[in-house]
UniProtKB/Swiss-Prot annotation:
Stored Pfam families: PBP
Protein known as: Putative odorant-binding protein A5
Signal peptide range: 1-19
Stored PANTHER family: PHOSPHATIDYLETHANOLAMINE-BINDING PROTEIN, PHOSPHATIDYLETHANOLAMINE-BINDING PROTEIN 4
Length: 210
């Protein structure tokens, strides 16, 4: 009986070490990719695990196509089932990294998420994927999770996807400070560049192809 117990304990230590390495890696990459302190004061405490289309596991800092990121992803972090969270996705490089005049573009915002159950949260902005303009180069995208003090009353009204108001120039720091959320408890960063799906999404959202 001792050997299986020791084996399980050893596996537990390995999993813990890998988790700590992942958490440290996402903090390092966010600093290297100039998220800290350009966009956030502090990095997330842990790596947010992101899976798109049930097949694509997001690796921090890697580049993916808008086609791969078109549907709302599944998220996983060390959530307290008794707590409420805010989940958001932003692009700080709109319309491009050299001239981010729309920083940050809000792609997703769900508040009052109980534990990991995003479907039971309150959507302020439904998810829509990356929209990097053609010839704009690579853009950064962040998905962040903040722990709320409790279930909160938010002033923000639900945003229409077809209306840029509220989506452009979204200030993450201002929003999270307003509701006293502190630093993100989990987060991840990835990149994307234009592909043929962008005109299709632009036409769906705004009635224009580019």
């Amino acid at each position: 009986m001792k050997l299986p117990a020791l084996h399980l304990l050893f596996l537990g230590f390995i999993c813990l070490a890998r988790s700590q390495d992942n958490d440290e890696n996402v903090r390092r990459i966010m600093k290297e990719m100039e998220v800290i302190p350009e966009i956030l004061d502090e990095p997330p405490r842990e790596l947010l695990r992101i899976k798109y289309d049930n097949t694509i596991d997001i690796e921090e800092g890697k580049t993916y196509t808008p086609t791969e990121l078109k549907f709302q992803p599944r998220l996983d972090w060390n959530a307290d089932p008794e707590s409420f969270y805010t989940v958001l996705m932003i692009c700080p490089d709109a319309p491009n990294r050299e001239n981010p005049m729309y920083r940050s573009w809000l792609h997703w915002l769900v508040v009052n998420v109980p534990g990991l159950d995003i479907m039971k949260g309150q959507p302020i902005s439904e998810y829509f994927g990356p929209l990097p303009p053609k010839d704009s180069g690579i853009q950064r995208y962040l998905i962040l999770v903040y722990q709320q003090s409790d279930k909160l009353d938010f002033d923000e009204k639900k945003m229409e996807l077809s209306n840029a108001d509220g989506h452009s120039n979204f200030d993450v720091m201002k929003f999270t400070q307003k509701y006293e959320m502190g630093s993100p408890v989990a987060g991840n960063i990835f990149q994307s560049r234009w592909d043929e799906y962008v005109p299709e999404l632009m036409k769906t959202l705004y009635g224009v192809s580019e």
